[in-house]
Curated annotation (Swiss-Prot):
Taxonomic lineage: Eukaryota, Metazoa, Chordata, Craniata, Vertebrata
Residues that bear Phosphoserine: 73, 142, 295, 415, 418, 422, 425, 449, 480, 606, 654
Task of the protein: Postsynaptic scaffolding protein that plays a critical role in synaptogenesis and synaptic plasticity by providing a platform for the postsynaptic clustering of crucial synaptic proteins. Interacts with the cytoplasmic tail of NMDA receptor subunits and shaker-type potassium channels. Required for synaptic plasticity associated with NMDA receptor signaling. Overexpression or depletion of DLG4 changes the ratio of excitatory to inhibitory synapses in hippocampal neurons. May reduce the amplitude of ASIC3 acid-evoked currents by retaining the channel intracellularly.
Primary gene name: Dlg4
Summary of subunit composition and partner proteins: Interacts through its PDZ domains with ANO2 and NETO1. Interacts with KCNJ4. Interacts through its first two PDZ domains with GRIN2A, GRIN2B, GRIN2C, GRIN2D. Interacts with ERBB4. Interacts with KCNA1, KCNA2, KCNA3 and KCNA4. Interacts with SYNGAP1. Interacts with ASIC3. Interacts with CXADR. Interacts with KCND2. Interacts with SEMA4C. Interacts with LRRC4 and LRRC4B. Interacts through its first PDZ domain with GRIK2 and CRIPT. Interacts through its second PDZ domain with the PDZ domain of NOS1 or the C-terminus of CAPON.
Protein name: Disks large homolog 4
Amino acid sequence: MDCLCIVTTKKYRYQDEDTPPLEHSPAHLPNQANSPPVIVNTDTLEAPGYELQVNGTEGEMEYEEITLERGNSGLGFSIAGGTDNPHIGDDPSIFITKIIPGGAAAQDGRLRVNDSILFVNEVDVREVTHSAAVEALKEAGSIVRLYVMRRKPPAEKIIEIKLIKGPKGLGFSIAGGVGNQHIPGDNSIYVTKIIEGGAAHKDGRLQIGDKILAVNSVGLEDVMHEDAVAALKNTYDVVYLKVAKPSNAYLSDSYAPPDITTSYSQHLDNEISHSSYLGTDYPTAMTPTSPRRYSPVAKDLLGEEDIPREPRRIVIHRGSTGLGFNIVGGEDGEGIFISFILAGGPADLSGELRKGDQILSVNGVDLRNASHEQAAIALKNAGQTVTIIAQYKPEEYSRFEAKIHDLREQLMNSSLGSGTASLRSNPKRGFYIRALFDYDKTKDCGFLSQALSFHFGDVLHVIDASDEEWWQARRVHSDSETDDIGFIPSKRRVERREWSRLKAKDWGSSSGSQGREDSVLSYETVTQMEVHYARPIIILGPTKDRANDDLLSEFPDKFGSCVPHTTRPKREYEIDGRDYHFVSSREKMEKDIQAHKFIEAGQYNSHLYGTSVQSVREVAEQGKHCILDVSANAVRRLQAAHLHPIAIFIRPRSLENVLEINKRITEEQARKAFDRATKLEQEFTECFSAIVEGDSFEEIYHKVKRVIEDLSGPYIWVPARERL
């Protein structure tokens, strides 16, 4: 078996030995978190599989030791591969497939997608099963040393470009920076768009995919995105750019630029339009692209006069990214047009569709006079093999570009200060929120078709909150395997629209809506933490008692109840600590209640009864979820005691729904239950971890169990101190 050794020249090479010498194993390497990569020519390697598959280009290989500190959300990357499930061909290596934004690896900035992991601390993971690699990473502790291999990036050509600002400014857009990586694992500032007619376009040397190293004398390597924005804004008419030109071979391993960039033109270009991305909800930033994304074909190489104008028949096979194009139009019979082709997607790979095509039909469904929604539904429901009749109509499409530009201006004008030409910098970039309402983008009258639908309780990572109406955000998944990125309505937009709705609803009444604005809920800021106990369970709403009883009887090893306290005398058959904790005096229990040692307490027949924090903690630390029959007020008291509960509200859809779920109660009882639930939701929505609904108790109970499973931890989201 080939093994990894280290010789005195600080080069790694493979030798024909069964095991590496002990003195050269990774455990005995110097613990230098920032040690430079070690370079070795591929002619010293005897493992062609690595030479062909790892990140970079053929030629030289580099090895790097990267030390990461495990964060609240883990190490912040995903892996694939292993002897039982090779990621590329027959190569058993463990590959990095994703760098999670905001995670430990992304913040460190050195680990890259397609890096091959050789060792985790002292554990050799070069030829192990996938589960063994996962276990090695899980058991590595809080400080993890990774030994990775990649191809050495090709040498970049460095040039200096002199630009003179014109009416359209510098005329290009950028993305990237520390904490806002354009390419996972790379903090560089990249050019993502050249604006036609701008200074960069007229000069002709700056291209999409170029890396900006410096502006005048200001370096842009390893800087925040906002710093790059400021450096480009604070320039005079003559600007000198230091630019690195990447090679095509390296670009093939890169990732497509995100849809939202910062534009340096007096006419903002923020890729916000009334269009539908007809693929998955993944952003283009997370989709592998072909080199042509960074090397756009010049228009004069394929003149518009060479493109046929008659209707064409195109067959596209839906891929994992959907069909891979956006559409606009559908108002007043104006037609449906393609506005964007996703690089590397099915439409792009077919080579048959282009921006400016009008879609006449989909699988025989006539779309010539269809609305935008009708066209989107037709394309979504078209199946795996989609037959499209399209006709190239650039003149008609140009009308949409003008309309889109006007919409952008209207949106941006609401969030830009006078005299500025770029998105206003906002200090609240990169924070996490929990949604306190359901949002269905199809019911929003706004024009952002790339909006992101979500449900109550979903955690969202806000990537960019610089616009006052729409925030760019990523839905956070517990498995960190997939990302849904899009636009969500800002807190201001949500609350303004809800306030307008309430005002319209109460218009003409004597009391009006005075004082209701404070009750409008949108989002709450959250932070992630690790817990080492089983979270208490509080179920609220109709049928909560039945759900509690079923959990205790069906899963006695996972759920338990705590022993309450009381001041009443112990009866002969009762045992202290089993039936109740009998408190010796009323004064003592009252003092403990005032000291917030109880999450809930009350009086019955002149005796005090209550549930103490310590009783709940004892059950939780035994690894059982403590089922609590308490009011919603107990949620905040448990949070204050650092025992963060899972609070589930069973929301009845209607009075009839209450009767259907519980057929044993009368209509009057159902009405009271429905009214109590309505009031409970109005007063305590922000305390709920999740809201469940159902047409039967069985459906509700199934959803309750799933919520508990999803929110059990060990990593959970809790309210943060910061306010939006």
